From Swiss-Prot:
UniProt-listed Enzyme Commission number(s): 3.6.1.41
One Pfam entry name: Metallophos
Single GO BP term: RNA decapping
Catalytic activity: P(1),P(4)-bis(5'-adenosyl) tetraphosphate + H2O = 2 ADP + 2 H(+)
One CC-aspect GO term: cytoplasm
GO molecular function, one term: phosphatase activity
Coiled-coil zones: none
Stored NCBIfam families: apaH (TIGR00668), PRK00166.1 (NF001204)
Role: Hydrolyzes diadenosine 5',5'''-P1,P4-tetraphosphate to yield ADP.
Keyword Metal-binding: no
Organism encoding this protein: Shewanella sp. (strain MR-4)
Protein name per UniProt: Bis(5'-nucleosyl)-tetraphosphatase, symmetrical
Length: 274
């Protein structure tokens, strides 16, 4: 069995299928792990979600910020932007089933036998594996509740929950987890989240900011961390225990697949229309 990890698909379904054909992916024996942001901007978010839903146990994804935003759009809490190319998905006859499936997906997954952890944006350097599991589970529980729209999704958009506080309770605790696992790129030197800078480290001109993965982390010493979200990195991080897989396919660059057992990356250039 092979484990394949794919970067932010964001509706680039044709490129995903090309990659899977190249590696002879077979869901009866292999597993496909996705770093989240299955939807938005690319041309076929609907086919992407349907495909992952159809994989059953052979498909593993985590929620990204665009996936959570889709929940808000479906709940009429936000207005759809034409640039997100989500109208076909939102108007699909099976949208309710797809949304229900999405709500069952976690913010983190792990492959214990390989000591691999996957989230969308990364892991706060202050967190141990036990804390990561615990905080992710709290959000998952909230998403599975019948009142998830009012209790969580309608209130998750906040830049104020930028600092980890283990004594926090309720919504602020959930907000920090969502912000950290789906939006994080840089931290200030005191450890709180920045939500503005999206540039690669070499282009960041704020001396108070450092990429989250440059902070000391016991978890990163013991595990390989697989993440996406930060397209500007283009997969370039100087640490063999970090696998940055967002390489900007929806922006005209590449979709990246990582074969765990071979420690090999395979890329597919964005296909031209027509």
């Amino acid at each position: 069995m092979a484990h394949y990890f794919v970067g932010d698909v964001q509706g680039c379904f044709a490129e995903l299928k090309r990659l899977l054909a190249e590696v002879d992916f077979n869901p009866s024996r292999d597993e496909l792990w996705a770093v989240g942001d299955l939807v938005a901007r690319g041309p076929d978010s609907l086919a992407t979600l349907r495909y992952f839903q159809s994989l059953g146990d052979a498909g593993k994804t985590v929620l990204g910020n665009h996936d959570l935003h889709l929940l808000a759009l479906h709940g009429k809490l936000k207005r759809d932007k034409p640039s997100d190319n989500l109208a076909p998905l939102l108007n699909a006859p099976d949208i309710a089933s797809l949304i229900y499936w999405l709500r069952q997906q976690p913010l983190m997954r792990e492959l214990p036998e390989h000591k691999v952890i996957m989230t969308h944006a990364g892991v706060p350097p202050q967190w141990s594996l036990d804390v990561l599991r615990q905080e992710s589970q709290l959000v998952s529980q909230a998403l599975k509740q019948g009142d998830y729209l009012d209790a969580l999704i309608s209130q998750m958009y906040s830049d104020t929950a930028e600092r980890w506080d283990p004594s926090a309770i309720g919504l602020n605790r959930l907000r920090f987890c969502i912000n950290a696992l789906t939006r994080m790129r840089y931290l200030y030197v005191d450890g709180h989240l920045d939500f503005d800078c999206k540039q690669p480290p070499e282009d960041c001109n704020n001396p108070q900011l450092r990429p989250w993965f440059e902070f000391t982390s016991a978890l990163r010493q013991s595990h390989t961390l697989v993440f996406g979200h930060w397209a500007a990195l283009m997969g370039k991080v100087n640490d063999p225990k970090l696998k940055a897989l967002d390489t900007g396919c929806c922006w005209g660059e590449y979709l990246t697949l990582w074969h765990l057992e071979k420690d090999q990356k395979i890329t597919q250039k964005k296909l031209k229309k027509g």
